[in-house]
């Protein structure tokens, strides 16, 4: 797009800036006027949830056959209530692991695949050799398996937990995908829609709350549904939704008070989308303070990103980067007026959480979060230099910076800050030293983002993305580049699965945050950048999670 000039005080006159023209916030003040529920009603809902929760615990305890245990756990996960029973599920899956699973009734494709998936998801490294029994002498999957739709769907879901060198799971994914795609046109509309959704978003890459909201509506139409589980899931979803609505109202008021929409009109106004993003990282009630902090950080980072990408001159960005590195309010006088607004907001967000952490004796965590922010803006400045020189780096050079500028290392460290006693200094040391699982999640983030957004960014004037870098370095077409990147994304997911199975690793809650970050990218960037260009997928997802009750 054409360069535009925007006059702001303290700037050199007639400074030419390449503006991105992001579309405005589509939600208006909707979430500012979230109606407060009667505390009596919420108290009653909480009491019902606690009563039903005890009934579900009895169900888990009374399940003794492996298939019964596995199907119940699968159901609890899909309904979005498994977070209530983490200890019980861990013990039950350990029990299943120790059981003899060779009985005929647990030997069908569905049971074997479900057992494999749930155990791998729990971080237990079970062998993929369990699927050998479903192959013929030539190593191909037996064609009669296609008569078992439930088994084929379960095998498809299990195959997404593959790691490098597991050719049988590569074959399983190809086998099930080809078959499921072939039958969709001949199925009834509801079943066709359900399988199409599964093909687009397998459980390994789905967002927990989005999946729960969808599955609750499917499960209630099942005539064999368990009334206790359905009632529990709906009550729990609606109670959590009320909490999330209150959080978003609080965040929206904070955002409105900052008035970035008027003070920094060249930036993206995506406070609702930012909150949805963080809901994908963690939705559980115990992380309510963490969600508020990280949502504020992510929204300020979005503004900072736009300052580096779409507005600031190189001279201004050098000063801005130095100010963030110094992290001192006295630096504010060196900044142009528009940067002062953002800089003050950034320091205030961290100061607010630092006060809360100091009361708990955890203020050391902010050091890690601040260092991650400093690394991020340093990467932004390198990219701004490239842009200023019209420089196209090599892929290795580009990725060394882009895996930081994608902000996933920052998101990882920052998401741990409010996670309670389990977030030890050792966890922060680990997260701050480029662990492989964070690095490969960042690869997924960067490549998926670049694939869908590079055309828009090149039109407005932007650094060369990985797409342009790879095409230039290898002399190949855009289509060939996309194919190569998609292969790298597949490999990155295998790396994530592999890291998830490592013994003596960081605790599961931290691994889950990283996996969830990769899931968000797969969900929102599969066809377009749904954060920058809010489309039907984002609109529908926000409505399902934050507006419409179950």
From Swiss-Prot:
EC numbers: 4.2.3.-
Keyword Oxidoreductase: no
Keyword Magnesium: yes
Motif (DDXXD motif): 305-309
Disulfide pattern: none
Record Gene3D superfamilies: Farnesyl Diphosphate Synthase (1.10.600.10), Terpene synthase, N-terminal domain (1.50.10.130)
Cofactor: Mg(2+)
Annotated keywords: Lyase, Magnesium, Metal-binding
Residue positions binding Mg(2+) 2: 305, 309
Note describing how the cofactor binds: Binds 3 Mg(2+) ions per subunit.
Residues reported to bind Mg(2+) 1: 305, 309
Residues annotated to bind Mg(2+) 3: 457
One Pfam family per UniProt: Terpene_synth_C
InterPro entries: Isoprenoid_synthase_dom_sf (IPR008949), Terpene_cyclase-like_1_C (IPR034741), Terpene_cyclase_plant_C1 (IPR044814), Terpene_synth_N (IPR001906), Terpene_synth_N_sf (IPR036965), Terpene_synthase-like (IPR050148), Terpene_synthase_metal-bd (IPR005630), Terpenoid_cyclase/PrenylTrfase (IPR008930)
Gene Ontology MF term list: magnesium ion binding; terpene synthase activity
GO biological process, one term: diterpenoid biosynthetic process
Stated role: Probable sesquiterpene synthase.
Miscellaneous comment text of the record: Does not produce any detectable product when tested in vitro.
Domain notes from UniProt: The Asp-Asp-Xaa-Xaa-Asp/Glu (DDXXD/E) motif is important for the catalytic activity, presumably through binding to Mg(2+).
Similarity comment: family membership: Belongs to the terpene synthase family.
Entry protein name: Probable terpene synthase 2
Source species of the chain: Ricinus communis (Castor bean)
